[in-house]
Design a protein with these regions (language model features):
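Substrate-binding groove of N-acetylhexosamine-processing glycoside hydrolases
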Residues: 1-196
């Protein structure tokens, strides 16, 4: 998550400065190399850049605004991985990823579905869409993709739970509605651009 990377980087930069380290290498890791745009970590790169010029990473918002847009808006990019209303320090997983790839009929992650996941995913998608207007247009695709992902997560995260409950009740109309929702989920996944 971006906020954790910035917090950890602040500690690393402080330690480097305190210990006299003058050269370091910053890396960005993406699962399978293509699951995350390298531009999603621009705020962390800006933090290191500010440190190179003698700052502590806090003064990078103004120069960042010139070439990328509002620095704080980039933190909306971590919202698909925040599907609960828990404080950020309690959320260090990539729930957006495992709910996207989860087979909702297998029930593997059903016990991990947050109670308000649908409402939180909807709000997150709206927040990401709003943040998009505060960044340079060349980075808009980051926000469009993740807002679309939130649309998928809104329907898919608790799909297995809802299907199991409807099945256990013998609620055929609810199951028929869920079958139709499957098509909507597939269409949303295609719209995200996250499939090959």
């Amino acid at each position: 998550l971006l906020s954790l990377a910035r917090r950890n980087s602040a500690a690393a930069l402080s330690a480097c400065r305190r210990c006299g380290v003058r050269s370091l290498m910053l890396t960005a890791w993406g699962d399978n190399g293509a699951e995350c745009s390298p531009f999603a970590v621009l705020p962390v790169i800006a933090q290191y850049s500010d440190a190179c010029y003698g700052g502590f990473g806090e003064a990078c918002a103004a120069p960042f605004a010139v070439w990328a847009g509002d620095l704080n808006s980039f933190f909306a990019l971590e919202l698909p991985n925040r599907l609960t209303e828990e404080p950020m320090w309690r959320q260090t997983n990539c729930s957006g990823k495992y709910f996207l790839y989860n087979d909702p009929l297998a029930g593997v992650f059903d016990s991990n579905v947050p109670e308000n996941a649908r409402a939180v995913a909807r709000r997150n998608g709206e927040a990401i869409a709003a943040a998009r207007g505060k960044v340079k247009k060349e980075y808009g695709y980051l926000f469009d993709t993740l807002a679309s992902l939130c649309g998928v997560l809104e329907l898919k995260t608790d799909f297995g739970v809802r299907a199991k409950e409807a099945y256990d009740r013998g609620d055929k109309p609810a199951l028929a509605a869920l079958a139709e929702e499957c098509g909507e989920i597939v269409d949303l996944v295609k719209h995200t651009g996250l499939t090959y």
